Amino acid sequence: MAPEQFGNPAARELGYCPCCGYLTLSEAQPGSYEVCPVCHWMDDPIQFSDVEYVSDTNHVSLQAARENFETVGAASEAVVEDTREPDEPRDPNWPY
């Protein structure tokens, strides 16, 4: 299955983080509310389906969080200290 423009449900079901693309979450449907230890993104079901939505949970949209991860290594500058370097595999279809 090719990645979709605004998220890849198949990749998320395998445990890949929708923000950074690393295999850090449990195998589940999008919206498990788990926090990725690599980028500190909370897996929010609304933001997974609407990447421009800014929630009270993550305080940035999924699209902005992906851009932030590429520049600062975290979903937002406010959570950089809560992240770590990845040692998990990354989704080969990354970026979404």
Residue ranges and their predicted role:
Residues V35, I46-F48:
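Compact nucleic-acid interaction/catalytic patches
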Residues L14, Y33:
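Residues immediately within or flanking Cys/His clusters that coordinate Zn2+
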Residues C17-C20, C36-C39:
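Short cysteine-rich clusters marking metal-coordination/redox-active sites
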Residues S26-E27, D44-I46:
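Short, non-ligating residues that shape and space the ligands of small metal-coordination modules
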Residues A2-N8, C19-E27:
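Short, intrinsically disordered, charge-biased short linear motifs at domain edges
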Residues M1-P9, V51-Y96:
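Short, intrinsically disordered terminal segments enriched in charged and Pro/Gly residues
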